[in-house]
Amino acid sequence: MEGLVTLILAAGLGKRMKSKHPKVVHKVCGKPMIEWVVDAVEEIGSKEVIVVVGHKAEEVKEVLKERVKYAYQEVQLGTGHAVMMAEDLLPEEGNVLILTGDTPLITSNTLKELINFHIKEGNSVTILSSVLEDPTGYGRIIRDKSGNVIRIVEDKDATEEEKSIHEINSAMYVMDIAKLKKALRMITNNNAQGEYYLTDAVEIIRDMDGKIGAFTVPSEEITGVNSRVQLFEAEKIMRKRINYRHMENGVTIVDPDTTYIGAEVEIGADTVVLPGCVIEGKTKIGSDCEIGPNCRIVDSEIGDGCSVTYSVILSSKIKNNVKIGPFAHIRPETVIQSNVKIGDFVEIKKSIIDEGSKVPHLTYVGDAEVGKNVNMGCGSITVNYDGKQKHKTVIGDNVFVGCNVNLVAPVKIGNNAYIAAGSTITEDVPEGALAIARSRQTNKEGWVQERIKKGRL
């Protein structure tokens, strides 16, 4: 919105979180709380965003980097004091949207409606309010007999009569900047907490003949996060929003209550997500896939028509029509091309598996290039580590690797080669060759009976 400046208060200690980290960097559905707020503000086109930081400021700056400007509140002396610390960064006129960094559930639609209401009503201050069944802990909106807002009283300073009011202050506002700057010079810390309340500025602006209004929204959006329990509650609401959005876009989520999908995940239409899945980071999943049950996928790309069952995929790329699992572990920097099968109890690490190949079960492939239409037998492994360094295995196209084979890297297997079961391969295998590297079998007939006679069995 043209000319709008946003001020986000994020300097609090967050003592109830019992954490060494600032409250606002704790994550909701994989994204720091403060980032949810900044995202919502950017969606409405705020001209400038200023964040007031204090406690562990560097951690907040590490999250937001250069997306915003910063003001510093070295000592936490209340919300009014926090705004004072940013006063020099505010223009002389216009409107400022004041938000808190611990309200990740606020949406851009609500902010647009709040600002439009403020402008339409010609208010000097518009308070974002809500009606709570239990308003304990929140400041109350005090209205006169005509319903006009006259002031806000903090919970700790409220009388018993005022505490019976259920309309609460969310600590989010739109304010006329010129009037706000005048009011900041007049507020005092003469209250139970010895702090400078921004709420006092509301009453001062009213006394300047400024019009005060309140825009009421559902309580869900203004919920602040002050403890781990409230973090869980916010997470639950956000997870429901995310899951419902995917379902509305054509994704089947069989049990949304047991499905965790991060904020930045993309999923194509007609994909089915079964119970117990955790899909995080910047993961992209194509159409017509079946994911789960009980999978974890992080920062990975999965193409169309794939099946992933009881498996973990980390920072990897999976092309189309790939079957993975059950109980496979795809580790970072792996690329699996189309029409590949990765079966049960298989681990793939930093490797390329080319089209049409099969790694069906009980196999480790690390630091390897596996060609097209390769079959890796049960129990086959690439021996990639010599105790100091990792080494590469290269397997050509149409190679058959028998069961219980060790490929000791660095080693190359030529196209169309066969590796006999039980072999430990330490040298390159030529194209089209059969490699056998195992001891000959020796049968000692009558050995068992002889041992029995001697009392040794």
From Swiss-Prot:
PROSITE patterns tied to this protein: HEXAPEP_TRANSFERASES
Gene Ontology molecular function: glucosamine-1-phosphate N-acetyltransferase activity; magnesium ion binding; UDP-N-acetylglucosamine diphosphorylase activity
Keywords, in A-Z order: Acyltransferase, Cell shape, Cell wall biogenesis/degradation, Cytoplasm, Magnesium, Metal-binding, Multifunctional enzyme, Nucleotidyltransferase, Peptidoglycan synthesis, Repeat, Transferase
Cofactor binding notes: Binds 1 Mg(2+) ion per subunit.
Spans annotated as Pyrophosphorylase: 1-228
Region feature (Linker): 229-249
SUPFAM superfamilies (UniProt xref): Nucleotide-diphospho-sugar transferases, Trimeric LpxA-like enzymes
GO cellular component: cytoplasm; membrane
Residues bound to UDP-N-acetyl-alpha-D-glucosamine: 9-12, 23, 73, 78-79, 139, 154, 169, 226, 331, 349, 364, 375
Major localization class: cytoplasm
Residues noted as binding Mg(2+) in the record, renumbered to the chain: D102, N226
Annotated localization: Cytoplasm
Positions annotated to bind acetyl-CoA: N384, Y385, A421, R438
Active site positions: H361 (proton acceptor)
Metabolic or biological pathway, per its Swiss-Prot or TrEMBL entry: Nucleotide-sugar biosynthesis; UDP-N-acetyl-alpha-D-glucosamine biosynthesis; N-acetyl-alpha-D-glucosamine 1-phosphate from alpha-D-glucosamine 6-phosphate (route II): step 2/2; Nucleotide-sugar biosynthesis; UDP-N-acetyl-alpha-D-glucosamine biosynthesis; UDP-N-acetyl-alpha-D-glucosamine from N-acetyl-alpha-D-glucosamine 1-phosphate: step 1/1; Bacterial outer membrane biogenesis; LPS lipid A biosynthesis
Reactions accelerated catalytically: alpha-D-glucosamine 1-phosphate + acetyl-CoA = N-acetyl-alpha-D-glucosamine 1-phosphate + CoA + H(+); N-acetyl-alpha-D-glucosamine 1-phosphate + UTP + H(+) = UDP-N-acetyl-alpha-D-glucosamine + diphosphate
Cofactor: Mg(2+)
Subunit architecture: Homotrimer.
Function comment: Catalyzes the last two sequential reactions in the de novo biosynthetic pathway for UDP-N-acetylglucosamine (UDP-GlcNAc). The C-terminal domain catalyzes the transfer of acetyl group from acetyl coenzyme A to glucosamine-1-phosphate (GlcN-1-P) to produce N-acetylglucosamine-1-phosphate (GlcNAc-1-P), which is converted into UDP-GlcNAc by the transfer of uridine 5-monophosphate (from uridine 5-triphosphate), a reaction catalyzed by the N-terminal domain.
Similarity comment: family membership: In the N-terminal section; belongs to the N-acetylglucosamine-1-phosphate uridyltransferase family. In the C-terminal section; belongs to the transferase hexapeptide repeat family.
PANTHER family in the cross-refs: BIFUNCTIONAL PROTEIN GLMU, NUCLEOTIDYL TRANSFERASE
Protein name as annotated: Bifunctional protein GlmU
Species the sequence originates in: Thermoanaerobacter pseudethanolicus (strain ATCC 33223 / 39E)
Phylogenetic placement of the source organism: Bacteria, Bacillati, Bacillota, Clostridia, Thermoanaerobacterales
Gene of this entry: glmU
